[in-house]
Structures are given as structure tokens and as C-alpha cells.
Amino acid sequence: MAMRPGPLWLLGLALCALGGGHGPRPPHTCPQRRLGARERRDMQREILAVLGLPGRPRPRAQPAAARQPASAPLFMLDLYHAMTDDDDGGPPQAHLGRADLVMSFVNMVERDRTLGYQEPHWKEFHFDLTQIPAGEAVTAAEFRIYKEPSTHPLNTTLHISMFEVVQEHSNRESDLFFLDLQTLRSGDEGWLVLDITAASDRWLLNHHKDLGLRLYVETADGHSMDPGLAGLLGRQAPRSRQPFMVTFFRASQSPVRAPRAARPLKRRQPKKTNELPHPNKLPGIFDDGHGSRGREVCRRHELYVSFRDLGWLDWVIAPQGYSAYYCEGECAFPLDSCMNATNHAILQSLVHLMKPDVVPKACCAPTKLSATSVLYYDSSNNVILRKHRNMVVKACGCH
């Protein structure tokens, strides 16, 4: 009875080995074939597991009028480029060096107590935290709101304070927890960043799924001011200037993947002989090319993962694919310095010469791995930036 191809074999079909070049797409000379529906599903499931995702995210489609770039995705795309530059040896960015995961949250509900109400005036924002993953430690959290220049009053000092709404009450003021205070001029323009990291312990310990933030504005002489008159924009602002929250996480441990069934290994039976091979027949010493004629020595080869070909560009923002690479080649004695061989690999190769049926050759394997970053939408339309460690082969060697 014919066996159905396993997921690892199908994964190999999704990853295209290249002859050379480092473009965003593999060259047309790369061997490819169209996968069947069942193969495609198995392959997608396997790669999702590698990416640490339980399933394929399915973000809600945006109406045509709302498809102009929004503030959170634009900011997260800048973070993605900064994280990519950091992985390539660029200057480290604030919070990014310690973060494995960055999540943005869009303001879901907004309430105001402004003109016509009793003072103090305030603006309140609410965020849905149901998508925060378990087992992640918060390293930093920020609230970002855009400020336009204000002439009411002209060129005066403003104090912007942020509080967490701990508990709401129907007959009295809500219980608040102070988070941050920023001082600026009324004529300033740009993104105002408020540190809300202190609120993260409450989310994680109490498993709160709704975060309320309240913002107050005061003048230098202590008078309460309508945040809108101070130039602070809310949900009615253009999409590229709407407020949002960003949280940086670091995984407490590597995600555990579900084990796959594996066939038991068959032990090779050694040949019964008391004679050593003839000296001129020792594999690897006198042959050109270190081993089987025509075989290349251990080195790195290119391997490309295409999210476009997987049909995932409806939720993957960047990249469209990436070069993962793989290691392949001979590790036959003598092992040159270019093979990055370990002392154990050299010893194993020597013993293999004497007893090739008992001790195998050293293996060509990665000696250095690096991370790759993926920016995508989750099923709640939050934008996620996740750094996946040990996903790209940087160097190969004999082990």
C-alpha cells in the first residue's frame, strides 16, 4: 500500500532550492510543480507550526473606504524594517532588542467628558486584550496619540497625564492608576508617546481583557483643558493619525510544537570482517573532492519560502517570502578548515575510515542561525510583529 507523503516532505515542496541570487523571488529556473489541495493544506499546517501559530489568521476584510493606510500598521511596518536592520547588524532600536513579539491594538471605544460637562475634562480609550498570548512577559507598552498645533491658548505649556481605569462606578468617579506624565507646548505637532508599561502587570495577573486609559490635559496654572482643543486627535481623525497602543513582549520559553509520528530507525548490521580496507581504497583520502566523486563539500545552499505562493498575503504584511537556506555536502576526511568541522567531527571521520559500517560520516549541519521577522494581521485585525529565532542558516559545518 502506497504511503501518503509526510508533512516534512511536503514542506520541502514549499521551500524552493535556488541555484543562486538573493532576489525577493526565486529564479524561474527553480524546479517547481503545482501542489494538490491536500498537499497544500498539509504544507501550510507544517509551516504555521514552524511559525508558532495554531492556525491561519483570518482578519476581517476592510471596506473600500477604510483601506487607506492606518496609523498602527504604518508604525508597525517601520518597526519591522528597524527589526530587520537590527538582525542584519544595524543600530539597535529602543525596546526591539529584547522583544520577540510586538502587538498593536486599535482604540475600540472612545468616550469624552469635554465642554458642557463638569471639570476636569478627559478623553477615555478602550482596548481589547483578548489576543494577548499566554506565557509572554511584557517588556514595554506605549500609548501613541497624534497632536496637532493648538492656538487655544497660544504657545503655553501643557501637562498631559495618563491613567489606567482600574474600576468604574455608577455613583462616583472611577478608580484610577497613574501611568505617565508628559509636558509640551501647545504649538507642538507630532506623535505623543505615553509609557503605560506599569499597567501590564494588572493585565497579566488579573487576566483583564479590556484596558481603559484616561487622558487629562492641564495648563501650567492647573486649569483643566479639553484634549480636543489641545490638538489631541481621537477616532475621528484621519486613519493615519488615529491613536493606538503598542506592547512589546519577550517569550518566557520557546513554543512547544506538537510531536509528529516518526518511523523507528533501522540499525545497520556491521559486516563481519577482520580486515581493514586496502589503503588505496580508503574513502576520502586519495579521492579528489573529498569523498564520492562529484559530490560537493559541506556548504550553504539557498532555500526560499514564498508566502505569496502559499496564498497568505491577505494576512502577511511583510515579507512576501524569505531565504531560509540549508546545509548539504560531503564531510569526508580530511576535513578542511573551510568546512568549520568540530574536533568531534574530525575524530568521527577518522573512525569512519576504519569502520565505515559501524560509525557514520560526520554530518553537514548549520553552525550559525539567525532570526527572521514576520509582520501580519491576527484574526482581530491587530497588527503583530513576531521575531522567529533560528530560522535562517548563516553558516554550515561538519558535526
From Swiss-Prot:
Entry's Gene Ontology BP terms: cartilage development; germ cell development; osteoblast differentiation; spermatogenesis; transforming growth factor beta receptor signaling pathway
Keyword Membrane: no
Domain of life where this protein originates: Eukaryota
GO terms, molecular function: cytokine activity; growth factor activity
Disulfide pairings: 298-364, 327-396, 331-398
Propeptide: 20-260
Protein name: Bone morphogenetic protein 8A
Tissue specificity comment: Expressed in testis. expressed in trophoblast cells of the labyrinthine region of the placenta and in the inner root sheath of hair follicles of early postnatal skin. Expressed predominantly in the neonatal mouse spermatogonia.
Family matches, as PANTHER family: BONE MORPHOGENETIC PROTEIN 8A, TGF-BETA FAMILY
Functional description taken from the UniProt entry: Growth factor of the TGF-beta superfamily that plays important role in various biological processes, including spermatogenesis, osteogenesis, steroidogenesis as well as regulation of energy balance. Initiates the canonical BMP signaling cascade by associating with type I receptor BMPR1A and type II receptor BMPR2. Once all three components are bound together in a complex at the cell surface, BMPR2 phosphorylates and activates BMPR1A. In turn, BMPR1A propagates signal by phosphorylating SMAD1/5/8 that travel to the nucleus and act as activators and repressors of transcription of target genes.
Mutant lacking the gene: phenotype: Deletion mutant mice show normal embryonic and postnatal development. Homozygous mutant females have normal fertility. Males do not show germ cell defects during the initiation of spermatogenesis. However, germ cell degeneration is observed in about half of adult males.
Signal peptide stretch: 1-19
Subcellular location: Secreted
Family: Belongs to the TGF-beta family.
Matches recorded under CDD domains: TGF_beta_BMP8
Glycosylated residue positions: 155, 340
Keywords: Chondrogenesis, Cytokine, Developmental protein, Differentiation, Disulfide bond, Glycoprotein, Growth factor, Osteogenesis, Secreted, Signal
Region (Disordered) location: 257-286
The organism of origin for this protein: Mus musculus (Mouse)
GO cellular component: extracellular space
Matching Pfam families: TGF_beta (PF00019), TGFb_propeptide (PF00688)
Induction: By dexamethasone in calvarial osteoblasts.
Keyword Nucleotide-binding among record annotations: no
Classification lineage: Eukaryota, Metazoa, Chordata, Craniata, Vertebrata
Main location: secreted
Record-linked InterPro entries: Cystine-knot_cytokine, TGF-b_C, TGF-b_propeptide, TGF-beta-rel, TGFb_CS
Oligomer and partners: Homodimer; disulfide-linked.
